[in-house]
Amino acid sequence: MIKLIILLFLVFLMLSCDSSNHIRTYHLPKIHHTNNETLQTKSQKPQLSGFTWEKPGSWIPSQGSSMRIASFDVPFSTGMGDLSVMELGGEGGGLVANVNRWRGQIGLEPLEESEIRAQAQPGESEVGPYQIFQFINDSNSDAAMLAAIFPMNNSTLYIKLTASKDGIMDLEKDFKTFCSSIKRNTNN
């Protein structure tokens, strides 16, 4: 009986050893982009999700989350910032909730609505008026942000630039120019 158990164990052991658990490598052909695709990537006026804009030539289109309409790596004198463009339905959570969430992301305490409204800088673009907010964490010079909120009929457009304090100071003018250039794409 013991010989049968040992024999069954050895058979089981040999059958369970399979080469399919080894690492496999595959070679895939490289995807070549046409000239037209390359030009669209470098376009100064992208037409994504119903909006167009003009960006500074130094801004580099980048991968962002699936929620973003667009993402850019934004170089400045001592580093790189991250700019995101997002559109959310309705009020997208509301002014107070969004501003206080952004403040929390850089280590700042929440504010009351009256304080938030007092800090808003007005702006104007072809899609309508918007508000810009500047957040700088004085205890952490690497934590700063510019954010713009564009309320529209059925949605809200958000543009957010995160960088260091120096980056925000360097990029503020370009950020405001970018926000003012936002237009609805009439080809949609």
Label each residue range with its predicted role.
Residues 126-144:
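Short, Gly/Ser/Thr-enriched beta-strand-loop segments that form substrate-interacting elements
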Residues 2-6, 15-81, 88-94, 100-105, ...:
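N-terminal targeting sequences that direct proteins away from the cytosol to non-cytosolic compartments
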Residues 9:
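Flanking scaffold residues of small Cys/His-coordinated metal-binding clusters
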